[in-house]
Structure formats: C-alpha cells, structure tokens
Amino acid sequence: MKFRVEREVLAEALGAAARVASTRNNAMPALSGVRIEVTGDKLLLSCTDNDLSVQFVLNVGGQEDGVVVASAKLMSDIVRSMSEGKVTVETTGETVSISSGRAQFTVPTFAATDFPNIVQASAPPVTLAASVFADALRQVVRAASSDMQRLALTGVLMAAEPEGLRLVATDSYRLAVRDLPGSNILGHGEKVVIPSRALNELQRLLASGEEASLCLAGDRATFTVGQATLSTSLLQIEFPNYRQL
C-alpha cells in the first residue's frame, strides 16, 4: 500500500477517527487502530470501538492498493507533528512508514483481519441542513448525563411527533427539548435513544458540511456528512418520561 496526500487533510481525518478508537480494550488491540485502505485514488479511514464507528473517504494520490491497521493515536500524532505539504504513507513488511521531506517515522501494524467489520444502518436516509441539526444538538446534548451508572440519562431521545422530530435530553436536573418540524425520520409513535457520546462526535463533523443524512434502522443509527460517516449502536433502554419532570 502506498499513497500521497496533503498533511492537513490526513491530519484532520486521523484526528477525528482517533477519538473513536478504543483505548481500553486489551483483548482486541486492533480496536485501538485505524484501518487504512487504498483503492485507486480513494483512501478509506475507519475506526471503531464496536459501539461507535467513523469512516472518512479522502481523495489521494494512490500508488499501490492495500490495507493496513495501525495505532490510530500514534498515526494521528505523527501526521499532526509534520510540516505542511505532501505526506507519503506506505507499508513495508509488518510496518507502515509516514514520511514528509526529511522526516520519516515507522509504526508497527496489527493484523488487518483482527479489525471488525463496521455495520451501518440500512434504510432510506433523510436529509437535514447541517447547520440546523448542529444547532439542535448543541442545545440538547449538553443536558445529557455523563454518569454511566445512569445509562438511560446518557442518551438523547429522538421521537416522532406530529410536526416532525423531537430531541430530548436530561440528567434529571436539567431538561432540554428541541423540535425539528418537517423532519420525518421516524414512523408514527417511533422513538430511539442515541448515546450522547456519538452525538458529540457528530457535532464536530457537522461543522464541515452543508447537509447531513440520517438513517435509523434496527439497533443502529448512521449519519453521513460530506465524506464522513458515523454509525452508532442505539441504547436499548427506556428513556425516562420527561413530560413528568
């Protein structure tokens, strides 16, 4: 595998991907890695912790197709430390090298077969203006709890209302509700609970796009903004009756 790309482009995507990679799963070291796949002039970066995943598609100067998995944090830190300009990434045996100008770094790799398949929701997507959705998330997500002992409060409720989609979050002390009229993402009476961590990462992605597509199906939610796709498991738990708070 070998490709060339602008440092800034690669650093931004790797930085976002590395935030999703697992830092605690010693049983599956590959979950701390970023999967780098080159096909022609397209680069696919993927990170996942099995619950939350993110993928980026970048245009690069592809020189040799291939797949490699290496530490997401290490790759991100190295590329970010390099000077502006083109960066070359290539595999040699069981290592991947990153070079730019006189600087060159070598990183060990994981077995690509140990990296799990990324599952996305499969249903017709609904498109929203990224700025509108980002504003709604900014108002609501901050009210969710960060206490994992109160799992139901760590998510954001998305519920179908007659006028569109309603977003709700609460930590039992604060309550935030935002309606998105005309956003018919869910069927009548349907509701899902999305982890606030996933929506915090989504907010970062929304800043760089004009539109966002949402797909809710089964036990997953998938969001696409530009060349980035974020997918998360839904919280299989009953959200509190916020109308009584």
State what each model feature region is.
Residues 1-245:
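Structural preference for solvent-exposed beta-strand-turn elements
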